Design a protein with these regions (language model features):
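PLP-dependent amino-acid enzyme catalytic core
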Residues: 1-306
Length: 306
């Protein structure tokens, strides 16, 4: 099965930039759909599912990488999946979200909540009713944040990565950040790039980390989750043209922009050898291009090559 073998991703050099050696860890190549940190997060979840829990319930937005990966893994493992979707307005327009359409085709049952109800997660009345209807359901938090998901993310780094000074990762729930913080060497620093402006990262990850030796760069959210600018899209297209590495517009694109911008402005202070973790999420490119097209803006041209 998908998760039954140990996998190391390749490290691809981006060359030297103003004296800094930059390498990207191609976690996006682990699997076509369950790529990057989604592979790591779900590995032990699916391996440890009890036989009497044939249903897995989880949460996500209309363009959630986590929902898409969970739906694919469920289909491969023969596990019925339920997706609790943020925003009841999506109930009658699934076809407008490539992500939700994919989840539906892979057998995931979708339920839509108002944003107020969604904020309550498993405590929402609608979710409680589902759990009563299916009492043996396995509940997976949004983004997969859990002890065994962090355990999977602790397998990202290997002995070859000990030469680097800084390990960079984009942040959603903080699960991948936690896995990296738990495995870096004393001379290394984890630099996190949040996808949104919020101050709760430490609160989210504290139960899962062995130390708090990480730093956050919060200047590269580009206005918030799933928001982009023409400058960011142009950077991502140029990056692909130069390196033939696709980036996603929600997480890795913003992180790479930030790293190069900090180096350019001589504000990078975390050593000369930089390892960037590519967390996948490329399924989010198609819906972003749809959004950009509707606004008459430039798109990520490399989507046709994925």
């Amino acid at each position: 099965m998908i998760f039954n073998t140990f996998k190391n991703s390749i490290n691809q050099s981006l060359g030297k930039h103003q004296g800094h050696t930059i390498v990207i860890k191609r976690e996006d190549q682990l699997h076509p759909i369950i790529s990057g940190n989604k592979f790591r997060k779900l590995k032990y979840v699916f391996q440890s599912l009890p036989k009497n829990a044939p249903i897995l319930l989880t949460f996500g937005g209309a363009f959630s990488n986590h929902l898409a990966a969970t739906a694919e893994a469920g289909a491969k493992y023969g596990v019925q999946t339920i997706g609790i979707v943020r925003g009841e307005e999506w109930q009658n327009k699934i076809e407008e979200s490539e992500t939700l359409s994919f989840c539906h085709k892979r057998g995931m049952k979708l339920f839509f909540l108002s944003r107020a109800s969604y904020s309550e997660k498993e405590n929402a009345t609608e979710v409680q009713n589902l759990l009563k209807q299916f009492p043996n359901t396995y509940l997976l938090p949004e983004g997969g944040l859990s002890t065994i998901a962090v355990q999977g993310c602790e397998e990202i780094l290997n002995n070859e990565d000990e030469e680097f000074d800084a390990i960079c990762v984009s942040i959603g729930t903080g699960c991948t950040l936690a896995g990296l913080v738990n495995t870096v060497k004393p001379h290394q620093k984890v630099i996190g790039f949040p996808a949104i402006q919020y101050n709760s990262i430490a609160t989210l990850v504290n139960p899962f980390i062995k130390n708090s030796d990480f730093e956050l760069q919060t200047d590269y959210t580009f206005g918030g989750y799933a928001k982009v600018t023409t400058e960011l899209i142009d950077f991502m297209n140029q990056f692909y043209q130069q390196y033939r590495i696709p980036l996603d517009p929600v997480y890795t694109g913003k992180m790479l922009f930030g790293i190069f911008d900090l180096i350019k402005k001589k504000k990078w202070v975390w050593g000369k050898k930089i390892l960037i973790v590519h967390t996948g999420g490329l399924q989010g490119i198609a819906p972003m291009n749809r959004k950009l097209s509707n606004k008459g803006l430039s798109q990520l041209y490399y989507s046709k090559y994925l």
